[in-house]
Structure formats: structure tokens, C-alpha cells
């Protein structure tokens, strides 16, 4: 079975940047390269360990999404993106282009939406799909042939979540119920009450 690996760009970029915040990687020009360094290392590790046939990286588009239109306060409490991350994104995109890795960015839709659509279609076409993100929201997308890899906090490696692991972790009968559970819990990171 062929394998497709889908990466949530900004979730992994932010994780790389803040993961190295106490010992940032600074280049000879004085630029903080932690976000690019960490993201590229993550990609390299995934290519080596997962050995995918296909890889795509989904980026959130500039500007708002349809969620902002429906709920103007969506993500309104988040801090401004650090300048070091804004600097790193084009560097990362250049690297992905050089590697021949597909990048996907759809106006008005978050990377989560894009990855969900691609994962569903690819699984339907018989591919094994691995979604790579620290974002727990993706657990609702797990199904047969679609799993999730979550980078571990403070440790190396990943937590692999398939259908059974999602059911056990979230105490649900079906991964589709994760969306209901998270909706009831609210989400402070996205400013959802």
C-alpha cells in the first residue's frame, strides 16, 4: 500500500520555534533560524522513518478563513506571529520546493481543512495516510488507513494514533465523536468558549 504523509506546516513551525526558545539557533547574520531548523529536521526524520511515497505540506492562508466570517472572535486572543517565524516561512517554502515536496494553501481554509480533505480522498483511493501535527483536533479525522503522528512534548519521537488509540485516549466509541467532545470542552487556543 502506498503511503501519503501530510504535515500541518504552521503547527510544526510554531512547535519547532518555541521548542528551541531557550537555546535558539542563530545564524552568522544574527537571524533566529530555530523554526526553519526544527521544521526541516522534522521533515527529514519523517522521510527517513516513514519512507512515504508522497508528501504534502499544508499551510494556513494569509488573512481570515470562513470560520472568521462565522465567528469574528475566532483565534482573536492569539499573540502576533513572531518576526522570526515570519522570516522562516519563505525559507521553509524554498526548502520544500528544492526537495520537490508539494505545498498546499487554499484561500479561506485552514491547513486542518485541507489535510482532512486530502486524507479522506487518499484513504478512499486506497492509500495509507499519516497526518503529522501536534494538534489534537486531527483525532476526529482518524479512520482505517488514516493515522496521526503527534510529536511528543519534551521527548523525542511521536505518538501514533490509529482508530483504537483515539478511542482509548479520548474515551469515545468512534473518532468522529472527538469533534463533539472538543466542541463541548471549548478551545482556549482558538478562543472558542
Locations of regions flagged by a protein language model:
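Non-catalytic, usually N-terminal nucleic-acid engagement modules in DNA/RNA processing proteins
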Residues: 1-56, 60, 66-73
Amino acid at each position: 500500500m502506498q503511503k501519503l504523509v501530510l504535515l500541518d506546516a504552521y503547527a510544526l513551525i510554531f512547535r519547532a520555534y518555541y521548542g528551541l526558545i531557550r537555546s535558539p539557533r542563530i545564524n552568522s547574520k544574527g537571524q533566529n533560524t530555530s523554526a526553519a531548523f526544527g521544521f526541516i529536521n522534522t521533515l527529514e526524520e519523517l522521510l527517513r522513518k516513514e519512507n512515504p511515497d508522497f508528501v504534502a505540506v499544508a499551510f494556513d492562508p494569509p488573512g481570515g478563513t470562513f470560520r472568521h466570517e462565522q465567528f469574528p472572535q475566532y483565534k482573536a486572543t492569539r499573540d502576533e506571529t513572531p518576526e522570526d517565524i515570519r522570516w522562516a516561512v519563505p525559507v521553509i517554502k524554498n526548502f520544500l520546493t528544492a526537495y520537490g515536496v508539494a505545498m498546499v494553501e487554499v484561500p479561506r481554509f485552514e491547513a486542518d481543512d485541507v489535510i482532512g480533505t486530502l486524507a479522506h480522498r487518499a484513504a478512499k483511493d486506497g492509500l495509507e495516510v499519516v497526518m503529522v501535527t501536534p494538534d489534537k483536533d486531527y483525532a476526529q479525522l482518524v479512520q482505517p488507513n488514516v493515522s496521526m503522528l503527534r510529536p511528543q512534548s519534551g521527548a523525542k519521537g511521536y505518538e501514533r494514533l490509529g482508530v483504537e488509540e483515539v478511542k482509548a485516549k479520548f474515551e469515545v466509541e468512534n473518532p468522529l465523536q472527538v469533534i463533539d467532545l472538543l466542541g463541548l470542552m471549548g478551545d482556549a487556543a482558538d478562543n472558542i468558549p
